[in-house]
Amino acid sequence: MFAKLEGLEKKYLELEEALAQPDVFNDQDQYRKLTKAHADLSDVVELFRRHRAVSEELAENRLLLHDEDPEIRAMAQEEVHRGEAELPNLEHELKVMLLPSDPLDEKNTILEIRAGTGGEEAALFAADLFRMYTRYAELKNWKVEIMSESPSENGGYKEIICLIAGDRVYSHLKFEAGTHRVQRVPATEAQGRIHTSAATVAVMPEAEEVDVEIRPEDLRIDIYRASGAGGQHVNKTESAVRITHLPTNTVVTCQDERSQHKNKARAMKVLASRILAAERERQSSELSADRKAQVGSGDRSERIRTYNFPQGRCTDHRINLTLYSLDRIMEGELESLVEALGTAAQAEALKAQASE
């Protein structure tokens, strides 16, 4: 580990030297690359230097334990205790920092929410989840764009697909994939009985052209007339688009825009992201036979979280975490859940690394 850290520090010093050159601003693209690489290394190098300083101080204070002066020995003993307590924590932080980063963490995210079991109540819950993620996005200064929506009769969603763009969106939302269960008394329930319903959430990194190769001959594109509620035609032009990726039989439809070209562009964006997510899923399955037991497996059949409204309780079943702050969570305050899931994923990765 320390040989790797020394290599990173050497690279950091080389970047500092490159950034100090007088002609560094001549090539703006290269300058941006250098500053980003320098910033990416700064935290781990700073922590490594702190670890080195504490190690050196600890060695010096251990020598002072044999000093003739009892006061110096007492002070040294106190410093040794402090150093011995701090060093393992620093080593753990360094191990976490050296874990391979997910290259997709930086990407924007396509979020798909679908009503599951529970009829209209499930559709209303799907709308509540969309609102929750929208509020979370507002708190993070992210931008939300609805790509496609299929409303239900009472203001819910049978399905809604959106693009969330901003800083490291996928790294925060990737553990939200799975089945979300709700327990509450529906507005339509006259007897006051608690009903259980569910919605599924799919989280996919936004695919770019370099991520996925889609050949035109692998696509079947159908154009048809968009229809609204009750079968009413939204407009008289054929602007709705259905794209089928023949090799994977992946189908995406989009009819929200009046422009056929805009609908096609949106459908292609969703299609590419689904194909990328499916390929990543296949690779992950091959790499880890027990991945379903891991945090963030993304298996949609897996019940990952329960929202119990009568008790004001939210339980994430993957990490056995229960929070009694459901009202705040539904208003988008998801950071406690996101951080806990991220910490659990890091612990799992460290365990896997240790067993290799």
UniProtKB/Swiss-Prot annotation:
GO cellular component, one term: cytoplasm
Gene3D superfamilies assigned: 3.30.160.20, 3.30.70.1660, 6.10.140.1950
Keywords on record: Cytoplasm, Methylation, Protein biosynthesis
SMART domains, sorted: PCRF
Cell compartment(s), UniProt: Cytoplasm
Region (Disordered): 281-301
Name of this chain's protein: Peptide chain release factor 1
Source organism per UniProt: Desulfovibrio desulfuricans (strain ATCC 27774 / DSM 6949 / MB)
Gene: prfA
